[in-house]
Amino acid sequence: DASDEYNTLATLEHYYPKATYPYLSLSFYNLIPCCSNCNSKFKGDSTHVGNILHPYYEDFDEKATFSVSVDSLPVGKDIELSISLKQNDINDTRCEKSIERFQLDKIYEEHKDIAKEIWNKAQVYNNDRIDELYKSFYKSLGYTKDDVKNFVFCSYLRKNDINKRNHTKLTQDILMQFELNN
């Protein structure tokens, strides 16, 4: 029954400002999907073209990484989460400008609970425990070790799947830091 169906509409942002480039205002190549919070928070006609990364043509994933700083994390304590440029892109001002313009540090500061959960799971489900789960249960059902990691960490861990679920890059980067995503 069609009345039981519902649709989710993505919010679209113009990469090239429509006030400056009106002829591009309806071009699909100029419309970038984004969350409504980001779209309303960072709207404006400020010219940023050339100063920030274009999400269709440049890969933020290859230029920046999330990491957590944890010496020993007692229960109830906060976790320190940061975004830093990868070594080969340390002088990439466009990546830095993207982080600044979209206030990614502040936005991901709000997701520290997710980072903490990933860190906690990484402590319990290390590579040995993943192997144990795989051999004792999942292998007989036809799953792979990657599937087990996806189940445990509630995310996709292959690079190709980074756009399939929210916070996948955050999860992948933290697990890479703990050598669980290799």
Indicate where each model-derived feature is located.
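Short Cys/His-rich metal-coordination motifs, predominantly Zn2+-binding knuckles/fingers
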Residues: D1, N37-C38
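Histidine-centered nuclease catalytic patch
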Residues: A2-N30, G44-H48, H54-E62
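A generic structural signal for solvent-exposed, polar alpha-helical segments
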Residues: T20, E62-K63, I114, Y125
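The −1 position to Zn-ligating cysteines in a subset of zinc-ribbon hairpins
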Residues: C34
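Domain-level detector of nuclease and nuclease-like folds
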Residues: K41-F102, K106
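C-terminal, charged low-complexity interaction regions
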Residues: S84-N182
